[in-house]
Regions:
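Beta-sheet-rich non-transmembrane sensory/scaffold domains
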Residues: 1-423
Length: 423
């Protein structure tokens, strides 16, 4: 949460800085603690209550400045509602969340001073960093702030983080894939709590030099990462020794995976896009990787659909697997398909089972020109719209798939049809 919106004065030029500073100091003097601490509003039925989310003694400040926001981590019994003292706060911003059974991590790209000069910004942009804040969590105790740390580079998503046996593993990307002077590459950093700090104890770099990180998955003593620019290097990481992680396997294939999902100890599914050897994207691709030999990963099977994508590429919640059956929502613009496909995984193969379409009989395509009237849209927002312009006509060529019964290809006001098409 951010502090309450105070009416700060921002100087318009260097000569007004002193005046703005004096005004803002007076504004601060007039504030109360409630203006700076996180607040809550609880709505229950027809009643509403408000209050302070956390007392001051439960707010912490990292050793290094991490922003003006307050990160609040709460532990509470839903049946009892929110109560004061049920959590902890840290003066920092937050973007990405990952949780183990007893630790809760929040990461964010490092805050930048707004007054930084252009030269300093250029130098800073070459060395992005990520702040990480750790909290202890438990069933019977409120969340507690534990430690903070910094790693070089930017974080892709929550699957780039994982905790195993007290060690936090995190994959970040440094540099830029398009800057020849400072080419990007990804790295895996292992961190350990010491006092109130997350300290680096292990590192392996060199993942995808000159490429961007597209997906990652860290599981116990093994990790997987996919980078891409023209081809897809699929990396296997040995995490058995947290002090000496290592890249032990690499596979170069066309396309890339943006979501990796383990099927069993020997197989991983990749959801992403197929591509040419030059990096031109072709459509949806599902890959099956055999990782039984960490030093020799293999893509044993693929399933593709041209000109298609899946929400599962961006949101893992759209991916479903039941035993050996994968259910994947798919949208294809060339085949005009919108629905889900069922794939069977087994014996190193991906087998197409069937599909479920989301189209209905009410959306059968038409290919004629027809008049759209207010009667057709009675009771909808389009009724007034059509009456105002004296009706509309739907224009579709006979060879086109046309619009649908509840939509249109191109709608032209009848009163203006001559202006568009003459006779």
């Amino acid at each position: 949460s951010a502090p309450n919106q105070l009416e700060w004065v921002y100087p318009a030029n260097p000569g007004s800085e002193d005046r703005a500073t004096r005004f803002n100091r007076e504004l601060i003097d007039e504030t109360t603690i409630e203006d700076w601490t996180p607040q809550f509003t609880l709505t229950k039925g027809n009643t509403e209550s408000t209050g302070s989310l956390l007392p001051c003694n439960d707010l912490h400040q990292p050793e290094k400045f991490s922003g003006f926001d307050v990160l609040s981590v709460l532990s509470f019994d839903i049946s009892e509602g929110l109560t004061e003292g049920a959590g902890v706060g840290v003066l920092a911003s937050g973007q990405t969340v990952y949780s183990s059974m007893d630790r809760f991590y929040i990461a964010t790209t490092k805050w930048v001073d707004a007054e930084i000069s252009e030269d300093e910004f250029a130098e800073w942009s070459e060395s992005y960093s990520t702040d990480i804040h750790a909290f202890s969590i438990g069933v019977d105790t409120p969340a507690q702030y534990v430690a903070s740390g910094i790693v070089a580079g930017t974080l892709l998503n929550q699957f780039s983080m994982d905790e195993h046996e007290g060690f936090l593993r995190i994959i970040t990307t440094t540099g830029s894939p398009w800057d020849e002077q400072n080419l990007s590459e990804s790295q895996l950093v292992v961190m350990k709590e010491k006092d109130n700090l997350l300290e680096r104890v292990g590192l392996v770099s060199g993942l995808g030099k000159g490429e961007s990180l597209y997906s990652a998955r860290l599981l116990d003593d093994v990790g997987f990462a996919v980078t891409f620019r023209q081809i897809d290097p699929f990396y296997v990481l040995d995490l058995n020794d947290p002090f000496n992680p290592d890249i032990v396997g690499e596979l170069k294939i066309p396309g890339f995976s943006t979501y990796l999902h383990p099927i069993d100890e020997k197989h991983v599914i990749g959801i992403g896009q197929n591509a040419t050897d030059e990096g031109r994207v072709l459509g949806l691709k599902v890959s099956l990787f055999d990782v039984s030999d960490k030093t020799d990963p293999r893509e044993t099977a693929t399933w593709t659909m041209n000109d298609a994508n899946s929400p599962a590429e961006r949101d893992h919640r759209a991916f479903q697997v039941y035993g050996q059956t994968v259910i994947l929502p798919v949208q294809s613009w060339s085949e005009k398909f919108n629905g889900a496909v069922l794939l069977e995984i087994g014996d190193g193969k991906i087998s197409y089972v069937g599909e479920i379409t989301h189209e209905t009989e009410s959306t059968e395509p038409v290919s004629d020109c027809r008049e759209l009237t207010a009667v057709e849209f009675e009771g909808t927002q389009f009724e007034i719209w059509i009456e105002e312009y004296g009706g509309y006509i739907q224009l579709c060529k006979a060879t086109d798939n046309g619009g649908y019964e509840d939509s249109w290809c191109e709608s032209i006001p009848l009163s203006a049809i001559d202006n568009w098409y003459g006779d």
